[in-house]
Amino acid sequence: MTAPTIPRSHPRYRSLMVRSDLAEKMAEGLVVPEGLMAHGRGEAFDYLLGEKTTPEAAKAERAAAAHLLLARHPVLSVNGNVAALAAAEVASLSKSLPRLTVEVNLFHRTPDRARRVADALRQAGVPTVLGEHPTARLRGLASDRAWVDAHGILRADVVVVPLEDGDRAEALVRAGKFVISVDLNPLSRTSQKAQLPIVDELTRALRHIDLGILRMRRWEPSRISTVAQSVEAPEVLSSALRRIRVRLDRLAAPEPRRGSPRRAG
Ligand code: PTJ
């Protein structure tokens, strides 16, 4: 099947290109069909949030950068969608923070998919990728997401889990990890369970975290710690929901009739 030509002038050019790329990567076996559904859900929330990083998400991304800088064993967990959408951003982040371990973790795990995800990351420039041949299991999880590397997620103190499912986020918290999620849905169980939920689109979030790391990496730990402590999870989630509500209220307000006085605000 050949991909359709998408004119650059199309108002949704970027979104259509991303979809076409994901569809191709599904045909190659990197992304699972369920990943396309997950992407559609993410897009819907991005629409509701205005398709840009909100000030609250930017603050959470700065805090995430601070947590990663302070962590002893920071790990970034990568699934099929993350590798397909953001391999370059993952590579850039691992360059900015060489201590960051990148680990493949799949819900729909097969040895072939684990290898494809690891290959995509290596091709993008990630020097070392764990999780292809997992060596341990996370307690209290029945799914294949429980498979982890003993030198990666199992010993991590801080774990970034983009596009995660709620069960594993919960299991990671139970295992004593500090969990940073990236999920456009503020209502998802993952966002609700993470100690630091980032409600933003994946590539935007990873770029902002990267910039935060570059900006703060020579700071005193106490100053970095102040940034890390500056964000409360419940406030991140309620501010995202308030933003959606205010935006919808504004958009749903009836157009003023010609000749009628304009509404204030
Ligand atoms: O590659 P695998 O086998 O590990 O499977 C990956 C998927 C994504 C299929 C699996 O983790 C899954 O089913 O995820 P969920 O439970 O659908 O959750 C994905 C969440 O990510 C949803 O809440 C979406 O709103 C959100 N999401 C999707 N795309 C983006 C996103 N959030 C931020 N940026 C995106 N680009």
Q: Predicted segment positions?
A:
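Long, charge-dense
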Residues: 93-146
